[in-house]
Amino acid sequence: MSFASDMKNELTRIEVDESNAKAELSALIRMNGALSLSNQQFVINVQTENATTARRIYSLIKRIFNVEVEILVRKKMKLKKNNIYICRTKMLAKEILNDLGILKKGVFTHDIDPDMIKDDEMKRSYLRGAFLAGGSVNNPETSSYHLEIFSQYEDHSEGLTKLMNSYELNAKHLERKKGSIAYLKEAEKISDFLSLIGGYQALLKFEDVRIVRDMRNSVNRLVNCETANLNKTVSAAMKQVESIQLIDEEIGLENLPDRLREVAKLRVEHQEISLKELGEMVSTGPISKSGMNHRLRKLNELADKIRNGEQIEL
C-alpha cells in the first residue's frame, strides 16, 4: 500500500463532532460528488477509488442526515483496473447539498462555503475532506517532495490554496488539463499540512524518512567534497612529482638549494600526504602550508623553464 493510501486510511479513523463532520463531508461531496435524476428523484453519487474513504463518506452521510446510503463497487476498465466505490443516497439529496453549502437557491456553487470553515477545527476538517477526495502525496523516499489536492473547479482549487495559506503553508495553485491543483513542494510545509489535518502517524513516518534521507544527502555531500579535495591533492602531488623527476634528470636534485632539495625529496617519498603534513616533516622545523606551497611552486616553475628550454639560475 502506498504512503498516500496509508495516510488516507489513518485520516478516515479520526473522530469528529457534527460541525467538523459536515465540513469534511462538504469537501468530499463537492469534489467527488454528482447529482443525477432517477425515476423523478434526485440522487447523490459520491465516487472514490479508496475503500476506506468510501466507508468514511457512507458513515458521515448516515450519521449527519440519518438517511439510507448504499455502496456500489465498479471495476475501472481503463489503465489500472482498480475498484471504484460509489456511495449513493436517494433520500433528501437537495436538502443534503443545501445543508453542506454546495447548492444555494437551486444553483451549484464551486467555491468554499464560509459556513463550512467558520473556525479552526472546521477549516482543518474541510482540508482533510479535500485531501481524502482529491489528494496525493509522494512517498518521502522518492526524489522530490510533493503534495497536491486536485479539484475539477478552478474557483474551488483557488479557495483551497487560500485556505492552506491561512496556515502559512506557501501553497501554490496550478491549472491542469481536467481541473486545477493546490500543491506544496517544501518538506516542512508538507509536514505541517499532515499535522494540520490529523495525519500524525503519516507525519512521523514522513519525518523519519526525511531525516534519514537528509542525513544521507549530507553524508554524500561531505564524501563528495572530501573526494574532490583528495583528487585535487593527488592531482597536484602528481604534477609536483613529475616536475621534481624532470629536475632530477636534467640538473640533479643535489644541485638545488637546501630549502628546495629537502622539500623535493619529501614530496617524492610521500606523494599521498597533504602540504600541511609534508611541512611538519621538514628537518629544520615545521613549515606552514603556504610555505610548502611556495617552495613546491618554485620547483614547478623550475621544471617549466626546463621544458621551455629557458636559462636556469639556481
Curated annotation (Swiss-Prot):
Pfam families, A to Z: HTH_WhiA, LAGLIDADG_WhiA, WhiA_N
Domain of life: Bacteria
Key words, A-Z: Cell cycle, Cell division, DNA-binding
Claim: Protein transport is one of the keywords in the record: no
GO molecular function, one term: DNA binding
InterPro entries with a match to the protein in the record: Homing_endonucl, Sporu_reg_WhiA_N_dom, Sporulation_regulator_WhiA, Sporulation_regulator_WhiA_C, WhiA_LAGLIDADG_dom
DNA-binding region: 274-308
Residues of the signal peptide: none
Record has Cell cycle as a keyword: yes
Any one of the GO BP annotations: cell division
PANTHER family: CELL DIVISION PROTEIN WHIA-RELATED
Family classification: Belongs to the WhiA family.
Annotated function: Involved in cell division and chromosome segregation.
HAMAP family referenced in this protein's UniProt entry, alphabetically: HTH_type_WhiA
UniProt-recorded name of the protein: Probable cell division protein WhiA
